From Swiss-Prot:
Pfam families: MFS_1 (PF07690). Keywords: Cell membrane, Glycoprotein, Membrane, Transmembrane, Transmembrane helix, Transport. Its main location: membrane. It comes from Yarrowia lipolytica (strain CLIB 122 / E 150). One of its GO terms (biological process) is transmembrane transport. It is a multi-pass membrane protein. This is Citrate exporter 1. InterPro entries: MFS, MFS_dom, MFS_trans_sf.
């Protein structure tokens, strides 16, 4: 028997049909619109045979199980973002407790750098070792890191454990999106990714609230004592609920498949680039030998990384083909710019509220709800729109447009700005973020190959984190340099000036200097204004870059390529070629279903990316694909190339006889016109 993959003429679903030696065939259904062969031993970058066989981990679930697994993924995403942003409002208190007022920004920077360094790796690791195993490792890492943060006695210990938290959080957010992409179809993916985006906003809301509540009433350490068991619950849920399609191959084969040169070069490049960028202007002088040498080394390894990925890696962590079209390149640029703007807001809005407005941690967290709650709501709405309408471009345009309006409004903030201006600015920005985060991801998946699904997600998250790290470093330098320049013009006591310059992110106690309070707050306001002005054109650039994104609907890259090919083949057939240019052993389906070819030597049938082997088809049958068959192979049974193919839904179905090798399927009676 030979197998053939096609779809119903009414629904965007793939139907696998097996035609045996009688005019009957079993039918099974797979609800995914994405199609690729399982265990394809193909070098994904160069099309050559690879020693490691990639395993298709698509695992479409029945609805009841889907809701359970997706709920677990949503909970993991919530915990991850609670952990990432829960300590932002507590940093001033942590700095005082650990005597680290001049270095406390590294509590956030260390996690973000570690997140960025490892983010690019998770896609390929999950391809090689399986989603479940890698997921369990990163969740256990998060639990251990949070326990370490809770027990930290020095700032150095805290920064190290926050770095491990960053490694784990990067894996959790990335793998959650990959798993959801495995268990739902592309058409439904916008809806489910939208709910995940809502969990991001919810985590960004709950985390600061819990951090503020624990800091003011218990201790900042209590935040981590809460997050650690929540992470443990994630591990238990993943272990018992997440289904696993374990990739084939031995542990040695899997270990050899890792792109070690790429991993080494990317890690060295990012560390050597981000550390001086994060500390330049505040902890290190920009023209110091250390900063210059680290930037040069990082730049060299960054170039080496892309050379390795493009020309030498057999299984690259970041295949350069994901930048190969204008649309995909624009979407990846979105990720970098979006990371700069979004992380800048997350870190510098609370600073404005606490340092300049003098609000408590709880009030600052409450004001931030205007942004993150709106983000959560609009993410769900935009995801529903994507799934129902099958389009994404107008959502992305609207998102970056309204985000730009909010960023412009933020540039008019003053020390005494009224609440209406603040709230509407945050509402507009939150709505914009909600319409950009997940729709850009769904668009990138729709425009890329199925086998690139995991690396598209990890690369996109990596670029967003990289943009965030660079953006925070630049914003930090802008604020520090603005404060220095502004305070030099004021007649401040030297001890107060040195105190501010050494720790620009932690407002000193001005009760001892009441006469200088307004001057210091004005300097902080000018610095924050400069940061907001810097972020505004970044968002505007995202809007401009969107013109390069094309909306082809929620179809897979393979399906669009197949349709383009068959349209060309149909044109040839209608122009009178009558299949004359087909090579021996081929059959052409000249409608919108792709090219069907048979290799007579291996007795195999190919449809698109799918292959089915065994015996030839019987004489006098019609393949259940809507279209017209043409063939010129003597090895094929005779058939009229003008026979009209009966639509699948017109076939009569009956149970297979007990002797059938596919007894779990259904018999389809082939009908001829």
């Amino acid at each position: 028997m030979f197998n053939l993959n096609t779809k119903s003429s009414k629904e965007p679903e793939v139907t696998e049909v097996a035609v045996d030696s009688t005019p009957s065939s079993p039918v099974t259904r797979e609800s995914s619109p994405e199609s690729s062969p399982d265990n394809s031993a193909v070098d994904l970058e160069k099309g050559k045979k690879s020693k490691f066989e990639m395993h298709d981990q698509t695992n479409l679930l029945p609805r009841s199980q889907l809701f359970l697994v997706f709920g677990a993924m949503a909970f993991c995403m919530l915990v991850s973002f609670m952990d990432q942003n829960g300590i932002s409002v507590a940093l001033p208190d942590i700095a005082k407790d650990l005597n680290a007022t001049d270095t406390i920004s590294w509590a956030g920077t260390s996690g973000l750098i570690a997140n960025t360094v490892f983010q690019v790796l998770y896609g390929r690791l999950s391809d090689i070792f399986g989603r479940k195993l890698v997921f369990m490792i990163v969740v256990c890492t998060l639990v251990c890191a949070d326990i370490g943060c809770a027990c930290a006695q020095t700032s150095t210990q805290l920064y190290i454990f926050r770095a491990f938290s960053g490694i784990a959080n990067g894996g959790m957010s990335c793998l959650t999106m990959i798993v959801v992409s495995d268990i739902v179809t592309l058409k439904e993916r916008g809806k489910y990714q939208g709910i995940l985006g809502a969990c991001v906003g919810l985590g960004n809301t709950i985390g600061p609230f819990l951090g503020a509540a624990f800091t003011e009433n218990v201790s900042w350490r209590a935040i981590f004592y809460l997050l650690a068991p929540m992470g443990g619950l994630c591990a238990v849920v993943i272990f018992f609920i997440l289904p696993s399609k374990k990739p084939q191959g031995s542990a040695i084969q899997k270990a050899k498949a890792i792109d070690y040169p790429g991993l080494f070069c990317s890690s060295v490049a990012l560390v050597f680039l981000l550390v001086p960028i994060a500390g330049g202007g505040s902890y290190y002088e920009w023209d110091s030998p250390m900063v210059i040498s680290m930037l040069c080394i990082g730049g060299v390894f960054f170039i080496a990384f892309f050379v390795i990925e493009g020309f030498f890696a057999k299984l690259p962590m970041m295949p350069l083909r994901i930048f190969g079209t204008k649309a995909l390149f624009a979407l990846m640029m979105h990720s970098v710019l979006l990371g700069i703007a979004y992380y800048g807001d997350l870190y510098y809005l609370p600073m404005y509220m606490r340092n300049i407005r003098g609000w408590s941690s709880m009030k600052a967290a409450g004001m931030s709800c205007a942004l993150v709650t709106t983000q959560a709501v609009t993410t769900v709405i935009s995801g529903q729109y994507l799934s129902r309408m099958g389009r994404y471009l107008e959502v992305i345009y609207f998102g970056f447009g309204i985000w730009t309006v909010g960023a412009i409004m933020k540039c008019f903030w003053k020390r005494d700005s009224n609440m209406a201006l603040l709230i509407f600015s945050l509402l507009f920005e939150g709505a914009g973020v909600g319409c950009c985060f997940q729709p850009t991801l769904v668009a990138a998946q729709a425009l890329s190959r199925k086998e690139d699904r995991s690396v598209v997600i990890s690369s996109r998250n990596f670029l967003r984190s990289f943009g965030g790290a660079v953006g925070l470093a630049v914003c930090s330098a802008i604020l520090a340099n603005s404060l220095k320049a502004d305070l030099k013009t004021k007649n401040l006591p030297s001890e107060l000036y040195e105190l501010i310059v050494k720790a620009p992110f932690s407002l000193p106690d001005l009760s001892h200097y009441p006469e200088y309070r307004d001057q210091v707050l004005d300097a902080y306001m000018n610095g924050s204004h400069t940061v907001f002005v810097f972020l505004c054109p970044i968002v505007g650039a995202c809007l401009l870059v969107t013109v390069f994104v094309k909306d082809h609907g929620l179809q897979t890259h393979e399906k669009k390529a197949a349709e383009a090919k068959t349209v060309e083949d149909k044109d040839k057939d209608e122009s009178g070629t009558d299949c004359e240019d087909m090579t021996k052993g081929e059959v052409l389906v000249s409608e919108k279903e792709g090219k069907l070819s048979r290799n007579s030597s291996s007795q195999s049938m190919h449809f698109g990316d799918h292959t089915a082997v065994n015996t030839p088809a019987p004489t006098g049958y019609n393949t259940p694909v809507v279209g017209t068959l043409c063939h010129n192979s003597p090895n094929f049974p005779p058939m009229d190339h003008n026979d009209v193919i009966t639509p699948l839904e017109d076939f009569d179905e009956s149970p297979l006889p007990p002797h059938s090798p596919n007894s779990s399927g259904k018999r389809v009676t082939i009908q001829e016109e």
